Design a protein with these regions (language model features):
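An alpha-beta-alpha
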Residues: 30-32, 48, 135-182, 279-300
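Flexible loop/turn connectors
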Residues: 245-298
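Short beta-strand elements in bilobed, periplasmic/extracellular small-molecule ligand-binding domains
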Residues: 54-74, 133, 179-197
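Short, low-complexity disordered leader/linker segments with a strong preference
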Residues: 1-29, 54-57
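Pocket-lining segment of extracytoplasmic ligand-binding domains
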Residues: 169-237, 243
Length: 316
């Protein structure tokens, strides 16, 4: 009888260790690949870690890696996660998600700060669920609302230049959609794309031919707001931004989500996947429930832009 009890206890202990991941430490091992360091992605990563820590406490350990804006680095980082057999991968931004999707079809992958999963993963017949080992959250803001913001703040403007990185699939998606809305409103829309950080300033200078510039949620732009500001502010050309971080750096106004809250929601999803409460293959992509009209006080003052009373000043 004692042998039977001892065997049963041993099996329980083994099952417990297995349930807490494959790290050998009795903890779930989570690899985080963040494309680049800038306020939006930083906030999403922090929110993710905070949520998962609140749900699982010390049963989770994080390996946080930054790709320094290079998609090839995402591939290297993700391959390292796969080799170390992490229990879950959090891919922060579209290139990180694409690298993870190419590297494994068994380890659960949760994306965040990804605008459009269908275009990022080249999915047909998109129904809101990726399936397989992938799900996550989207940072897609209401592009119709952002177009309406441009019209509200600059009713006399005739031309809008859209400034973005052509190598980011999420940016191209937003450009295509908002161009349709702006054209319907009567604006003449011109896209101005840069390929990397080296030509941000020169392309921004060309975009200043427009009355207003719009910048979508774009990681390269978010990492180069100072360079953009150094061009648009002296030229007296206002920028409406797709998210708060870009607006803080070079814009006048934004209709933005909270990237911290988005990351937090992703962390809650991760907890359910790790504990077996939910199957990732059945989890639909989640979207931010709230959007906030915000403005940059300093830039608005410098450019003489007046915003309605329902806009909130950006913090920091």
């Amino acid at each position: 009888m004692k042998k039977i009890i001892a065997l049963a206890l041993a099996l329980v202990m083994l099952a417990s260790l297995a349930a807490c991941g494959g790290s050998g430490s009795g903890k779930y091992k989570v690899g985080i690949c963040q494309l680049v360091q800038h306020p939006a992605l930083d906030a999403a990563t922090q929110g993710f870690q905070d949520a998962l820590t609140k749900q699982l406490g010390d049963k989770v350990e994080f390996d946080v890696q930054n790709a320094s804006g290079e998609p090839t680095n995402c591939t290297t980082i993700i391959n390292g996660f796969v080799s170390s057999k992490v229990d879950l991968i959090m891919a922060n931004a579209t290139p990180a998600l694409q690298a993870a999707a190419s590297a494994t079809d068994t380890i659960p992958i949760l994306g965040t700060s990804v605008t459009d999963y269908a275009s990022a993963l080249e999915l047909d017949n998109w129904n809101g669920t990726v399936g397989g080992n992938i799900s996550g959250t989207s940072d897609l803001a209401p592009l119709d609302g952002q177009a309406a913001m441009i019209q509200e703040l600059f009713p006399d403007a005739k031309t809008v230049g859209i400034l973005y990185c052509s190598s980011e699939a999420n940016s191209q998606y937003q450009v295509d959609v908002i161009t349709g809305y702006l054209t319907e409103m009567g604006f003449t829309v011109t896209p101005y794309s840069f390929t990397d950080t080296n030509d941000v300033a020169s392309v921004t200078q060309k975009a200043c031919d427009s009355a207003v510039i719009y910048i979508p949620t774009d990681n390269t732009a978010a990492s180069n707001t100072e360079a953009i500001a150094n061009v648009v502010l002296p030229a007296k050309v206002p920028v409406v931004a797709g998210e708060a971080g870009i607006c803080q750096g070079c814009g006048v106004a934004t209709l933005s989500i909270s990237y911290y809250d988005l990351g937090y929601a992703t962390g809650l999803m991760a907890a359910k996947v790790l504990t077996g409460e939910a199957k990732i293959s059945e989890m639909p992509v989640q979207y931010a429930p709230e959007f906030t009209k915000q403005y940059n006080e300093a830039n608005c003052a410098a450019l003489g832009v007046t915003v309605p009373a329902d806009y909130s000043p950006l913090e920091g």
